[in-house]
């Protein structure tokens, strides 16, 4: 958990990963969130945690919603994000027999939006999100249909 807490380098990266958290991310904040989530998953490279994600909602035989996605800054644009999202998709399909996967991405997270659309996720809704500083963002909801076999 300590290593995952160090992945977001600044307030904006933490906001993209975990909008309700305070920077810097602490073990207690992370523990309190993941206790209510499913299948927290890390990507390891040479025994170093380089990526993290989980499901914040699971509806068996329907959909899983992927959240808390982050990749170590040193490993961005090197396939780790793709590997991580594919791993979460596999868990959703095999463990929960889902036909859709959902995720959310803020409008300012260009890298995330480009990755998710490259992986086949399509926007279906945009929500107004107001952060702790009362700043407004657009939270883009995306989904991907999949063969659950």
Segments from the language model and where they lie:
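Conserved glycine-rich acetyl-CoA-binding loop
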Residues: 68, 72-86, 106-114, 118
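Acetyl-CoA-dependent GNAT
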Residues: 3-76, 85-87, 91, 145-147
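C-terminal "cap" of GNAT-fold acetyltransferases
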Residues: 99-102, 106-113, 118-149
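Extended, folded domain segments that form the structural surfaces/walls around functional sites
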Residues: 68, 96, 103
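Conserved acyl-CoA
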Residues: 83-100, 122
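Serine/threonine-rich low-complexity intrinsically disordered regions
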Residues: 19, 26, 78, 122-125, ...
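Residue-level preference for beta-strand/loop junctions
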Residues: 35, 62-63, 97, 136-138
């Amino acid at each position: 958990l300590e290593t995952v807490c160090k992945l977001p380098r600044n307030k904006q990266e933490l906001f993209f990963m975990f909008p309700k958290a305070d920077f810097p991310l602490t073990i207690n904040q992370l523990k309190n969130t993941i206790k209510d989530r499913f299948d927290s998953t890390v990507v390891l490279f040479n025994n170093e945690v380089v990526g993290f994600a989980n499901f914040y909602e699971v509806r068996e035989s329907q959909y899983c919603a992927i959240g808390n996605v982050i990749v170590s800054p040193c490993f961005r644009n090197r396939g780790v994000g793709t590997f991580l999202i594919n791993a979460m998709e596999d868990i959703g399909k095999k463990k929960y027999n889902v036909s859709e996967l959902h995720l959310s991405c803020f409008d300012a997270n260009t890298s995330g939006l480009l990755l998710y659309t490259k992986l086949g996720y399509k926007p279906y809704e945009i929500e107004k999100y107001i952060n702790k500083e009362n700043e407004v963002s657009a939270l883009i909801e995306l989904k991907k249909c999949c063969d659950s076999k």
